[in-house]
């Protein structure tokens, strides 16, 4: 391969040699080196520094391991649109970023150190542990940086933001202070999802990312009523899917407006095999209280209603016997409910509107330590919060039966005990979706403890309003997945009881827990402390040691760190160190809000949410305007990639096999961006074959024939804004001529019909691709370009091959201009191969033009060069050619065998001028193109009965009706059915003697008349006259000779322009054909001399043709 950085001088006019084959992975590395030597990315930023800003926000990856193929997906899209906008002249500052804090990093370090949880970290020490976390981040960044360069993702790595940098942490503090000042940040004792392995709460958007299907017990238990009208003779039938929480049962909730009934078990008849549940009990004690709508569903047969019923509101404050007395219930201050004091410290019926009658029994077990609704309800009744579960998820050792057991494993022994004591009424196992930690896979527990919350519910309407002015791709996300999330928004549990994260900037008065000070910077903290802290590391444990005294009271920092999602959600301003770092105000204000963000679809409940939430909370405006959601990456068989299945494909080996462009094109163009993608070697290779290699082969073709003819384009290919001279656009900087050496390209209006068609098609492509990219629709871009490349190669180039061979200026100029435009259009999606082409075709021939395709201007469509009429006529011509090929295939007539004529409908022929008719004649290899009036003139019809349809109408008479159809004139029958839709036929066996036959009752087939091959499709017909005259036969033989000689040239390794002498030996018939067409053969194969000679042993032989030749280069 030639030098990728050619010497650029005015004497460098010729294309570089472009080989027909290309090693895409090897090319990648050459182009990466070229960009590095020429500082191409930096130059693209410099060239557009005064352009209109177009802001792209990089969602920071967590550098805690090796990057996967899914990381390539997001980076492809995050590279395409900034490249596109840069070529349009926008200033796109592409700042990289790294998400450094949080559980992902901590868990990776714990694994490296062999730790099993927080106690190990505390023993090891927070300072050395956080140092390990910092080192882990910097170590894994190298792997992501390698991927970024290898795939051609242009992003500013040198000035990347790090969420662990002190300036970034201070910016997050500043944002929290704004939220604090608005009264939207505070501490509360709530039930929140909690990971016992990681020892910290999770936010609602983290919770949504970790649901898995689990098989758990669903149990019905009986609580004896101890007060009220049913005391001592009925039991509350309570349903729960968390048996382990029954140890902490505090109340039973009912709906105030639901009617509850008393059900009695029917006596078991003597001699019956039926076994009653808990049959040892007194029958009277079997009375169960259940919601009336659920009686049949839960109890049903074998149970009867006693006639007693109560509204839920009437059952309020009834006491009952709890299932376990393992714990000591704390004494609480009794409250008054509707003028009545609560009857006990715990275990009585309470009212709750959230109780439903869709599942369960209508009576809901309450354990306020483990349920947000439970906690809210029980607080209203002054009930205690009883929690025997330790932070590691195990029961306290003092709890009988389950002490020391993990909460999920305690279900089994508790259910067995309930059954043994007659408390269990029914146990069923069911599958349901249960939350797990999205990072470590541990079962989560809803756990009551104090946490810091951002009150996002207070800005719900603002968030919904911001969503309305945001453009989502796909649009369904706006009011679907994301809109639903906002509608059901709950407060953000922002604190984490961990170590490696942004410390919460909150200092609490040791003597008054309600007295809390929020600081926005180290500078402000310095004022409280009385010494300069601006140079310190704001992480734990250093920041924990900072205390200060105010009004005689000592303040210590609260121990929690912030949710890492707060870090990433703050990046629009924190990446600049806003507002503390000098110059950050200008940078932030010129880049906010962002024009474009892009990540996988699960970020609707992650980064997309926190970015909108933080922007709205801090600035009253969302952080972004347009967001593209991406589908997930799957293995080739449709399964999720996992180490367990052994189907993980690492991105760099994929690119080393197929090239970065192949993977990029596949990600961008193979399906809509938001659809899941099946990635595999075969699917990627198909991309290479269908698009990239076809594009490359077309480039190689242009170079081959341009060099063979000594042709070179002018100094600039878009020479004139005059539409008659080319695509329009850039006027070259050179003065005195429109072309290199004074060469002026032929006017478009003066070019061949194929050239004019291609100029029009290229401008249409520019228009459509630009529109699609402006709408972030890479699938449409891919389809448009793939179709264009196919038409360029398989229609324009093939039909123009003779003109290229002859050095036709119009053809060479047109393909040169087309390839220049096409290369620009493809550059954002496949930057490597387009750069290779740019260097070999356009840098070498235009020393004053852009030195990289990525420094070139985006093409603009010239509407004056779009010829819709010509496009329609060319489409018709191509359809006729396809039909003609089909007719040849049906008749098994080789394309090299000339035929006398092809017939098409007169209406179609009238739409084709002589130029296009000539193209059709040449492509179909026919001597003449004529018209016919009706396709029926070329075929014979055959008709027979459709027995399936006839049988439904005529039953036993069907054979007689079918016989009548077969006896009818098929031409008449086909015509009548086509015109009238039905035909009445004489059939005595049918009632009334007449059978009405419709088109469904008849199978009409067409058979071309002898000597013709006819193909009809969508109202267009092509008929080929198959008669082969002796003259046509010899012409066909001559073409076979040309084909064999050309093959012999290739096998001899000759260049396309090499002249030869041709010695030949053939049978008498073939010799006549060769001699008759000698001039044509010699021109096609570049033979300066042809001679008939006796065959020698070293000659090439074609036995089927009866031909032997010897090719010698002159």
Swiss-Prot record:
* Documented EC number(s): 6.1.1.5
Class of this enzyme:
ligase
Catalysed reactions, as listed in the record = tRNA(Ile) + L-isoleucine + ATP = L-isoleucyl-tRNA(Ile) + AMP + diphosphate
Could you state a single Gene Ontology molecular function term? aminoacyl-tRNA deacylase activity
Where it mainly occurs, coarsely classed, is: cytoplasm
Q: Which UniProt keywords apply?
A: Aminoacyl-tRNA synthetase, ATP-binding, Cytoplasm, Ligase, Metal-binding, Nucleotide-binding, Protein biosynthesis, Zinc
Q: Where is this motif: 'KMSKS' region?
A: 640-644
Q: Which domain of life is it from?
A: Bacteria
Q: Where does ATP bind?
A: 643
Q: Which Pfam families match?
A: Anticodon_1, DUF5915, tRNA-synt_1
Subcellular location per the Swiss-Prot or TrEMBL entry: Cytoplasm
Q: Where is this motif: 'HIGH' region?
A: 61-71
An individual GO BP term = isoleucyl-tRNA aminoacylation
Keyword tRNA processing present in the record's keywords: the answer is no
Cofactor(s) this protein cannot do without: Zn(2+)
Does the keyword field hold Iron? no
Q: Name one GO cellular component term.
A: cytoplasm
Gene3D superfamilies with a match to the protein in the record:
HUPs, Isoleucyl-tRNA Synthetase, Domain 1, Valyl/Leucyl/Isoleucyl-tRNA synthetase, editing domain
Q: Belongs to which family?
A: Belongs to the class-I aminoacyl-tRNA synthetase family. IleS type 2 subfamily.
Q: Which NCBIfam families match?
A: ileS
**Domain writeup:** IleRS has two distinct active sites: one for aminoacylation and one for editing. The misactivated valine is translocated from the active site to the editing site, which sterically excludes the correctly activated isoleucine. The single editing site contains two valyl binding pockets, one specific for each substrate (Val-AMP or Val-tRNA(Ile)).
On subunit structure and binding partners, the annotation says: Monomer.
Q: What name goes with this protein?
A: Isoleucine--tRNA ligase
Identify the species of origin. Answer: Cutibacterium acnes (strain DSM 16379 / KPA171202)
| UniProt lineage | Bacteria, Bacillati, Actinomycetota, Actinomycetes, Propionibacteriales
Encoding gene (name): ileS
């Amino acid at each position: 391969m030639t030098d990728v950085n050619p010497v650029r001088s005015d004497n460098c006019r010729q294309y570089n040699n472009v080989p027909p084959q290309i090693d895409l992975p090897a090319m990648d590395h050459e182009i990466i080196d070229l960009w590095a030597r020429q500082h191409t990315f930096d130059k693209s930023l410099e060239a557009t520094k005064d352009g209109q800003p177009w802001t792209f926000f990089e969602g920071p990856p967590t550098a805690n391991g090796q990057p996967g193929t899914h990381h390539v997906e997001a980076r492809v899209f995050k590279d395409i649109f900034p490249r596109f906008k840069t070529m349009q002249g926008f200033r796109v500052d592409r700042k990289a970023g790294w998400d450094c804090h949080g559980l992902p990093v901590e868990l990776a370090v714990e694994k490296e150190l062999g730790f099993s949880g927080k106690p190990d970290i505390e023993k090891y020490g927070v300072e050395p542990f956080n140092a390990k976390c910092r080192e882990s981040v910097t170590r894994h960044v190298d792997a992501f940086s390698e991927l970024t360069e290898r795939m051609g993702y242009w992003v500013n790595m040198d000035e990347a933001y790090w969420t662990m940098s002190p300036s970034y942490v201070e910016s997050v503090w500043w944002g929290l202070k704004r939220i604090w000042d608005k009264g939207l940040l505070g501490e509360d004792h709530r039930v929140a999802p909690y990971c016992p392995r990681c020892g910290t709460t999770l936010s609602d958007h983290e919770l949504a990312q970790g649901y898995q299907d689990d098989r758990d017990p669903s149990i019905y238990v009986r609580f004896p009523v101890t007060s009220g009208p049913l005391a001592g003779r009925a039991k509350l039938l309570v349903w729960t899917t968390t048996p382990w929480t029954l140890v902490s049962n505090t109340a039973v909730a009912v709906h105030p407006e639901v009617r509850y009934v008393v059900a009695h078990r029917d006596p078991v008849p003597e001699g019956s095999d039926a076994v009653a549940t808990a049959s040892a009990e007194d029958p009277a004690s079997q009375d169960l209280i259940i919601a009336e709508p659920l009686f049949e569903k839960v109890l049903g047969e074998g149970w009867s209603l006693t006639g007693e019923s109560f509204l839920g509101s009437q059952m309020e404050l009834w006491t009952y016997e709890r299932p376990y007395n393992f714990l000591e219930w704390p004494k609480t201050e009794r409250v008054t409910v509707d003028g009545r004091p609560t009857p006990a410290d715990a275990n009585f019926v309470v009212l709750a509107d959230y109780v439903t009658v869709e599942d369960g029994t209508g009576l809901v077990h309450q354990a306020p330590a483990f349920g947000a609704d439970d906690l809210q309800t029980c607080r209203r009744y002054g009930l205690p919060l009883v929690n025997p579960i330790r932070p590691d998820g195990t029961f306290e050792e003092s709890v009988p039966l389950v002490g020391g057991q993990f909460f999920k494993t305690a279900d089994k022994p508790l259910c067995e005990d309930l059954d043994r004591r007659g408390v269990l009424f029914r146990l069923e196992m069911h599958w349901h979706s249960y939350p797990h930690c999205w990072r470590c896979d541990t079962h989560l527990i809803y756990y009551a403890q104090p946490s810091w919350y951002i009150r996002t519910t207070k800005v719900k309407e603002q968030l919904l309003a911001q969503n309305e002015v945001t453009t989502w791709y796909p649009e369904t996300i706006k009011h679907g997945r994301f809109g639903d999330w906002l509608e059901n928004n709950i407060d953000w549990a922002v604190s984490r009881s961990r170590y490696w994260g942004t410390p919460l900037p909150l200092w609490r008065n040791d003597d008054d827990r309600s007295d809390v000070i929020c600081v926005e910077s180290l500078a402000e903290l310095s004022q409280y402390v009385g010494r300069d802290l601006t140079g310190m590391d704001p992480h734990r444990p250093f920041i924990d040691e900072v205390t200060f005294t105010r009004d005689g009271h000592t303040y210590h920092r609260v121990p929690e760190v912030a949710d890492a999602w707060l870090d990433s959600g703050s990046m629009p301003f924190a990446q600049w160190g806003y507002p503390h770092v000098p110059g950050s105000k200008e940078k932030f204000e010129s880049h906010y809000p962002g024009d474009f963000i892009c990540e996988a679809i699960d970020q609707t409940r992650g980064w997309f949410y926190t970015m909108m939430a933080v922007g709205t909370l801090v600035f009253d405006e969302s952080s972004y305007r347009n967001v593209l959601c991406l589908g997930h990456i799957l293995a080739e068989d449709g399964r999720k990639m996992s180490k367990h299945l052994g189907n993980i494909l690492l991105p760099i080996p994929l690119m080393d096999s197929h090239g970065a462009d192949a993977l990029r094109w596949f990600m961008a163009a193979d399906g809509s961006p938001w659809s899941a993608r099946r990635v595999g070697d075969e699917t990627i290779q198909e991309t290479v074959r269908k698009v990239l290699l076809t594009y490359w082969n077309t480039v190689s073709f242009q170079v081959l024939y341009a060099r063979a003819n000594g042709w070179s384009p002018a100094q600039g290919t878009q020479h004139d804004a005059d539409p008659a001279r080319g695509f329009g656009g850039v006027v070259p900087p050179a003065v005195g001529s429109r072309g290199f050496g004074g060469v002026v390209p032929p006017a478009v209006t003066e070019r061949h019909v194929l050239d004019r068609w291609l100029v029009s098609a290229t401008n249409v492509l520019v228009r459509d691709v630009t529109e699609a990219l402006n709408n972030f629709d890479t699938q449409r871009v891919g389809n448009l370009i793939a179709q264009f490349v196919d038409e360029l190669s398989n229609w324009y180039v093939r039909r123009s091959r003779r003109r290229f061979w002859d050095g036709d200026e119009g053809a060479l100029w047109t393909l040169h201009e087309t390839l220049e435009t096409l290369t620009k259009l493809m550059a954002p999606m496949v930057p490597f191969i387009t750069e290779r082409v740019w260097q070999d075709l356009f840098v070498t021939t235009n020393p004053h033009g852009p030195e990289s395709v990525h420094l070139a201007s985006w093409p603009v469509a010239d509407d004056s060069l779009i010829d819709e009429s010509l496009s329609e006529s060319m489409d018709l011509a191509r359809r006729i050619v396809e039909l003609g090929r089909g007719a040849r295939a049906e008749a098994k007539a080789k394309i090299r065998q000339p035929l006398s004529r092809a017939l098409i409908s007169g209406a179609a022929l009238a739409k084709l001028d002589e130029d296009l008719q000539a193209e059709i004649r040449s492509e179909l290899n026919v001597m003449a193109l004529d018209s016919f009036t009706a396709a029926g003139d070329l075929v014979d019809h055959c008709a027979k009965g459709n027995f399936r349809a006839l049988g439904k109408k005529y039953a036993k008479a069907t054979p007689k009706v079918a016989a009548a159809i077969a006896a009818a004139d098929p031409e008449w029958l086909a015509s009548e059915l086509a015109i009238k839709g039905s035909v009445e036929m004489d059939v005595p066996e049918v009632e009334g003697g007449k059978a009405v036959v419709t088109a469904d009752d008849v199978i009409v087939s067409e058979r071309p008349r002898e000597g013709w091959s006819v193909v009809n499709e969508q109202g267009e017909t092509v008929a080929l006259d198959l008669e082969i005259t002796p003259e046509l036969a010899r012409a066909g033989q001559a073409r076979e000779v040309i084909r064999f000689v050309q093959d012999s040239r290739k096998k001899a390794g000759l260049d396309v322009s090499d002249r030869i002498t041709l010695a030949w030996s053939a049978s008498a018939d073939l010799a006549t054909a060769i001699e008759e067409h000698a001039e044509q053969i010699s021109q096609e194969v570049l033979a300066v001399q042809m001679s008939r000679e006796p065959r020698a042993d070293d000659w090439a032989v074609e036995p089927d043709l009866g031909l032997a030749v010897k090719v010698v280069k002159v």
